[in-house]
């Protein structure tokens, strides 16, 4: 310690230099209300990745990946697991429904060879919380109550996501480490939690002993996959050079803090959720790619300023085959909203964008883009936090000429019609973020890379 007011040495302990930050992770996030095509971007990047991670959400997410003409659906697993060389990591911020996890693997194994050997390539954080069947049942009851009491529900996926994050925040939840450590102790805590739920929801039926029997069987299967997640990530970041990819679920406008509350999910699906959901510091975040559909869609209810509840919306819905992967619900469709995208950029600091489904706009003679919101005739400077205000905004549009050409066979930017190129450049200029990929179809080959 420095004496008599003398300055301390510049380097702590006189010679301990700061550690090198280690490997960077590449993050892929949804920039709208979900369903932007994140799985496709991840699939592209996962081809030479070493580790692919999920950091938040549960099996309420839905990612589709097409490999060798086989369409795989992922809800809980990182979709990058389709690469046989990849280690998939489910972080502590994810909530895990064990029956859902094994059902997902079985369904995908029947479709093709993409998931072979998955058990040896999956690591699950011991700090991840477990979704129980009664969480899912409670989710359904809560939705029913909202409908009866307020005349509208939140439109949840009924996958138990809200209730399990509630248990986590109330500190009554159970984690993977509890399941695989001492099953007797786990069983006692499970009974307490189940009885709490029965007290809150008298109509809820829980076969406690039956559930525990099933959970014990899952425990045997999952135990080899459960590891200390913090140590796993630290080793991955500070060991030999590795390409680490983080696959965000849901999207910016569904974030519990920054989304169109209350019509949101229950986790942080913006860039901050990467650090808290994996147990890693922000200096290890590298590229942050925002995935943007060339128009806008939303599942369920909630404000949607650029929605086209007309023939335009129907045409977008039909051409884009806009149905939710998890719920099968029709997606609401509308024009691209740059006010909303600027807001998503402010929170996430996207380093580049992936613009997907540009080919869906092929048939429109002119294309509108929302560039500002007005309230009582005045342009408002920010994306409103209040849902009622957002519901009332009037959108100011910029109209761009369409290209009336099938672009699905384009493989370079120069092969796109001039008006399609101008549409992409307009988005870049308005947002101040470069577009790195343009999607013009379903296959891997139909992602045009610009740089």
Curated annotation (Swiss-Prot):
IMP binds at residues 35-38, 60-63, 157, 171, 250, 265, 329. GTP binds at residues 34-40, 62-64, 331, 357-359, 439-442. GO terms for biological process: 'de novo' AMP biosynthetic process; IMP metabolic process. Gene3D superfamilies: Adenylosuccinate Synthetase, subunit A, domain 1, Adenylosuccinate Synthetase, subunit A, domain 2, Adenylosuccinate Synthetase, subunit A, domain 3. One of its GO terms (molecular function) is GTP binding. It comes from the Eukaryota. It catalyses: IMP + L-aspartate + GTP = N(6)-(1,2-dicarboxyethyl)-AMP + GDP + phosphate + 2 H(+). Binds 1 Mg(2+) ion per subunit. PROSITE patterns: ADENYLOSUCCIN_SYN_1 (PS01266), ADENYLOSUCCIN_SYN_2 (PS00513). GO terms for cellular component: cytoplasm; mitochondrion. Inhibited competitively by AMP and IMP and non-competitively by fructose 1,6-bisphosphate. Substrate binds at residues 35, 325-331. It is found in: Cytoplasm; Mitochondrion. The active site is at 35 (proton acceptor), 63 (proton donor). PANTHER family: ADENYLOSUCCINATE SYNTHETASE, ADENYLOSUCCINATE SYNTHETASE ISOZYME 2. NCBIfam families: PRK01117.1 (NF002223), purA (TIGR00184). Plays an important role in the de novo pathway and in the salvage pathway of purine nucleotide biosynthesis. Catalyzes the first committed step in the biosynthesis of AMP from IMP. Belongs to the adenylosuccinate synthetase family. HAMAP family: Adenylosucc_synth (MF_00011), Adenylosucc_synth_vert_acid (MF_03127). This is Adenylosuccinate synthetase isozyme 2. It comes from Gallus gallus.
